[in-house]
Swiss-Prot record:
EC number: 7.1.2.2
Recorded catalytic activity of this chain's protein: ATP + H2O + 4 H(+)(in) = ADP + phosphate + 5 H(+)(out)
GO molecular function, one term: ATP hydrolysis activity
Chief localisation class: plastid
Protein name, UniProt field: ATP synthase subunit beta, chloroplastic
Subcellular location(s) per record: Plastid, Chloroplast thylakoid membrane
Name of the gene this protein is made from: atpB
Superkingdom of source: Eukaryota
UniProt membrane topology term: Peripheral membrane protein
Entry-linked SUPFAM superfamilies: C-terminal domain of alpha and beta subunits of F1 ATP synthase, N-terminal domain of alpha and beta subunits of F1 ATP synthase, P-loop containing nucleoside triphosphate hydrolases
GO CC, any one term: proton-transporting ATP synthase complex
Stretches of the chain forming a coiled coil according to its record: none
Complex formation: F-type ATPases have 2 components, CF(1) - the catalytic core - and CF(0) - the membrane proton channel. CF(1) has five subunits: alpha(3), beta(3), gamma(1), delta(1), epsilon(1). CF(0) has four main subunits: a(1), b(1), b'(1) and c(9-12).
Length: 490
């Protein structure tokens, strides 16, 4: 549907439904029962507006039709000030949000309302958050790599264009900086934009991310249209309805950039577990029978409805990076287990690498990708990646021996492996554009071909004479060679 047709339909619906009023008959926390006149029941997922005693409009979403002209809805904000008998207006359509370039550099709530105190968003287009996944005939079926310009990711755990990537890592290991660098690189290298969905995480973290994005230039305060990201927040202090739907709000914004602007989009969801958790809360509030470990019986369906919309089409792509919280480190828990079924790659951040000062602290042995197989990547890429992993794995096995007996007790062959593995480990570090203000080192975007060439030179022994420190925080291999020459001169 064209944007002009969509707007006309929205106006018609708004006029047609303006007299479709119901009455609130029960309020239990964020769940409301509303009765409507005969023949005027709203559809499931329709948005309903209710005016509370403070003259503020509260938006609810219809979840169940109960019979006897009653519906059960879940509020998207707190229900303070609401009372029985309050008038409820059926909008005749799902929650609709502003989309387009006007959303860049702004922060929105689940309803698409700006919450950054920078004034209203004047957008020509609005889209409902509930939309079908692209048809099979519209999908891009040939798998291709989404180049990020980050060596460790592109070489050892490459991302699929239109794929889903799980991001695992504790506090303080560099998740935020990695996310910001990806946002920066997708804008520069692919002419794309990013959408960040903060689902059920801490408000402080959301604020910190926003401030860091402004400092690093990802959000351009002077001209918001030059910003590279739109942000949607439904934080952990908000009702479960908001946390359950804010992921769809972010996804809808991303879909517009893909389908209408025909761009490559990065969609970040932090945290996908909180999406499931919010769905579980809503399910319990609606009185559904719980499933395994107390989760909602519709867990697989809800996750599938979200994930199936994240894909590559013939027009553009949405590549999604999802932070995954694993409750009690139990990978068999239904929430992470359901998420894993949809992932194409995993990026695991290691505290041990961060402690060594190697950033990005991506664990080269724990991170995986379904793209790293012959037939999808080139033979040279596949062989290089396998050899790098083998060398690092052998180094890991030798570390106990080195700690007890020392390096001198190793065979000549093992000493060579250790020397090259240390160079590889250092070379996997990389200066980031968004960290320039902190490190004083200019950021580097490294193409996949340059990454393969560099690691091949280390593996073949061409740079055995260069000290390992020269490989730390450089981009291409040539920079390491130049760095070593400068050290020699000084």
């Amino acid at each position: 549907m064209k944007p002009c047709q969509l707007k006309q339909k929205q106006k018609t619906l708004a006029i047609a439904k303006v007299n479709n009023k119901g009455k609130v008959i029960q309020i239990i926390g964020p769940v409301l029962d509303i009765v409507f006149p005969d023949g005027q029941l709203p559809k499931v997922f329709n948005a309903i507006k209710i005016n509370n005693s403070n003259n503020n409009w509260i938006t609810c979403e219809v979840q169940q039709l109960l019979g006897d002209n009653k519906v059960r809805a879940v509020a998207m904000s707190t229900t303070e000030g609401l009372k029985r008998g309050a008038s409820a207006i059926d909008t005749g359509e799902p929650i609709s949000i502003p989309v387009g370039k006007e959303t860049l550099g702004r922060i929105f709530n689940v309803l698409g309302e700006p919450i950054d105190e920078k004034g209203p968003v004047i957008s020509n287009d609005k889209l409902p958050i509930h939309r079908p996944a692209p048809k099979f005939t519209q999908l891009e079926t040939k798998p291709s790599i989404f180049e990020t310009g980050i060596k460790v990711v592109d070489l050892l755990a490459p991302y699929r264009r239109g794929g889903k990537i799980g991001l695992f890592g504790g506090a303080g290991v560099g998740k935020t900086v990695l996310i910001m660098e990806l946002i920066n690189n997708v804008a520069k290298a692919h002419g794309g934009v990013s959408v960040f969905g903060g689902v059920g995480e801490r408000t402080r973290e959301g604020n910190d991310l926003y401030q860091e994005m402004k400092e690093s230039g990802v959000i351009n305060e002077k001209d918001l249209n030059l910003s590279k990201v739109a942000l949607c927040y439904g934080q952990m202090n908000e009702p479960p309805g908001a946390r359950m739907r804010v992921g769809l709000t972010a996804l809808t914004m991303a879909e517009y950039f893909r389908d209408v602007n025909k761009q490559n989009v990065l969609l970040f969801i932090d945290n996908i577990f909180r999406f499931v958790q919010a769905g579980s809360e809503v399910s319990a509030l609606l009185g559904r029978m719980p499933s395994a470990v107390g989760y909602q019986p519709t867990l697989g369906t809800e996750m599938g409805a979200l994930q199936e919309r994240i894909t590559s089409t013939l027009d553009g792509s949405i590549t999604s990076i999802q932070a995954v919280y694993v409750p009690a480190d139990d990978l068999t828990d239904p929430a992470p287990a359901t998420t894993f079924a949809h992932l194409d790659a995993t990026t695991v951040l290691s505290r041990a690498l961060a402690a060594k000062g190697i950033y990005p602290a991506v664990d080269p042995l724990d991170s995986t990708s379904t793209m790293l197989q012959p037939g999808i990547v080139s033979d040279e890429h596949y062989t290089t990646a396998r050899k790098v992993k083998e060398t690092l794995q052998r180094y890991k096995e030798l570390q106990d021996i080195i700690a007890i007996l020392g390096l001198d007790e190793l065979s000549e062959e093992d000493r060579l492996i250790v020397s090259r593995a240390r160079k590889i480990e250092k070379f996997l570090s990389q200066p980031f554009f968004v960290a320039e203000v902190f490190t004083g080192i200019s950021g580097k975007y490294v193409s996949l071909s340059d990454s393969i060439k560099g690691f091949n030179m280390i593996l073949s022994g061409e740079v055995d004479n260069i000290p390992e420190q020269a490989f730390y925080l450089v981009g291409r291999i040539e920079e390491a060679i130049d760095k070593a020459k400068q050290v020699e001169k000084s």
